[in-house]
Amino acid sequence: MSNSFTLPLRPARQKANREDDLAVKIAQINAQKGSFRDVTEASLLAEIEAARAVGDGEAEAVDVKTGEDEEENREEKLFKSRLEISQFAMNAHMEATYALEFVSLLLSKHAPRQAETSMSPLLKQKVPLGSLGADHIKPPEQSETQKRDVDAVSRGWKLESFDAAANKLLQSAQRLEEDIAAETKYWSEVLKIKEKGWKVCRLPQERQTLGVHFGFLESTQNFRDRGLAALRKGEAGRLILDRGIQLKPPRFVRVRVQRGDQTLGLTIPAISKQLDDQCLDGRIREARDSLYEEELFYELNREARVLLQYGVEIRRDLLKFPADDNKHIFVDLVGLDEALPDIGGLDPLDNLLAEGVAKSFRILLSYAHRKNHHRRTRVPPPVTPNKRPAPEYNIIRPLLCYFQHRSHYQWFTSFFGTLSKTLRSAGLKCSYTLYPLMKRPQSRAGSSQQTLTVSSVERLIDTLINPSESIISCNLISQGSVFRVRITTNVNPNGLGSEFELVTNLAHFPAQQSPFRFGLREDVRDLIIHLFTLDLVYLVPSLVKGSASAGASQYLISRYTGSQAFVEEESTDENEFAPSPAAKQDDVYLLPWQPTFPQQGELTAYSPARCRTKKLQIQLQSDQLQLRCFWVRHRGPSTKADEQPGERLFTWRAVDMLGGAEESSRPTLQRVMELLGEKYDDQTVQNIGSK
């Protein structure tokens, strides 16, 4: 038995009961072609060729007409179709009205009152009631030939009707099959979109149309409403993403790093343009990314308006803020088709910096959306007539805080590096330890259970938006003397900036007041140089060996240590120099050095052999250390030797550590102090360290 069963829609052709006789055929030929005398072979061939030509012409005319119909505008077809439908409706209404008038007038002869209710006023006025009647008549009898003709005509009409019905059924079946295939393809693509995680819903304005939501629910209202697009069915069931009439080309936020007019770093587009229209998921992602970039630039502009006092500039569609002392960050919104410069000639580090800034922008905007979600899911505050403010998102502030903090940290790192090289060139030990970017924990309001619900990602971002802190711990030259510099940069809009805190622990000043807080890094630098100068002043007496007895040296050092260093001015002589001890004045050429004015870096030493006082001045900068030693003029009767001050100058520079010279070839501070304590030190001016 066959598996398929076919049901023919067209009726079976039946042969005629009998063929027409010869007389009938001859009569038909005479009626169509004329007399047989005019029929020749040439005329028949000519007639056949003419029929062929007419057939080809009709085919070409049909093709031309079909092409012209295809070129017609769809709108014109729509108007024509609507006009035809209106005309058909009017004709049907008129024909129905005429039929009603006819039947009413016909019935008015037998039931005038009932028929009068369905007659129009014009018909009542023009035609009297009962003027139209109908009677049954006996139809005339038909001959056998007429009956056969009527049966043949009826059978022909039936066959033609069945054939037309079969064609319409087959066309309907084909159209239904195409519609089923289109619907299957449409819903399969909708299902693919749903399976990929996109939210499919009905459009608010068109409930019968499906749409896909690719926006962000926590965005502002302008961008939240634009995050919904219709999923319309195109040709052959192809899915079309309809975003409305305000469609813009995809754009992205571009970040550039510039020094002056020179571009050092540049970001690549965060979204890629979809050239393949068949990839619907790619086009949805492109629409989502483009909308996200537009919202990001909008929020950056909002925040930049309140940060103008912190160096942020707005130039039409361009944002600018400083990255360090020499570089600036430029942010703008550009299209994907805009020509980009060749990034091959740019600095890779600056490219990474630009990429980091762009990604930080996007992460902080997503974090702002997360905070909006938490705020929306919490218990709402009491209803008030005042409109709740919409504060700006913290997107630029954390980066400003980071760049400012990094600039200060690098500046102090360079300062301590140069200062340590300067001291090492003089043979002194100076070490410092760096603790960069230590994030202070921010206290959270709420119970411990609420704190535990915070995800690790949010805790990570909290460290980014909290104040930044770095610590530099440095050991002074003297043993046990240390200080610590704390650099703190706040993100709070009411106090955005850096604060410097200096905590000291000096062996020579156990009762010092600390910490010291500053707002300028130059003030911190001056205080650090001052601390090193004080440390050097009290270190110099311990560097000299063999110039005096251990007891006298210990006595002098302890005398000027601690708080007594600033209160023993009454023991000085009229030359404002401390008197030298009288012990062993005949044997000692130069007594130990005494800090006379430690705040100014001055020391003095008395020479019993020459009855004069020698002064030593210490001048410390970050890149050089300078010692200036000379005799103080005596007020009594001068000799020829006293007229020559015997000034000597010693300099150590940080660049000496980069010259490649060995440390043994450079005189140290201890060696210089030993030379200054010898009897033959009165030589011409020297400059140690400069080559």
Swiss-Prot record:
Coiled coil: 158-185
One GO-annotated biological process of the protein: regulation of transcription by RNA polymerase II
Transmembrane segments: none
GO cellular component: core mediator complex; mediator complex
Keywords per UniProt: Activator, Coiled coil, Nucleus, Transcription, Transcription regulation
MF GO annotations: transcription coregulator activity
Gene3D superfamilies: 6.10.250.2620
Entries under Pfam families matching the protein: Med17 (PF10156)
Subcellular location: Nucleus
InterPro entries in UniProt: Mediator_Med17 (IPR019313)
Assigned protein family: Belongs to the Mediator complex subunit 17 family.
Subunit text: Component of the Mediator complex.
Protein task: Component of the Mediator complex, a coactivator involved in the regulated transcription of nearly all RNA polymerase II-dependent genes. Mediator functions as a bridge to convey information from gene-specific regulatory proteins to the basal RNA polymerase II transcription machinery. Mediator is recruited to promoters by direct interactions with regulatory proteins and serves as a scaffold for the assembly of a functional preinitiation complex with RNA polymerase II and the general transcription factors.
Official protein name in the record: Mediator of RNA polymerase II transcription subunit 17
Species in which this protein is naturally found: Coccidioides immitis (strain RS) (Valley fever fungus)
High-level lineage: Eukaryota, Fungi, Dikarya, Ascomycota, Pezizomycotina
Gene: SRB4
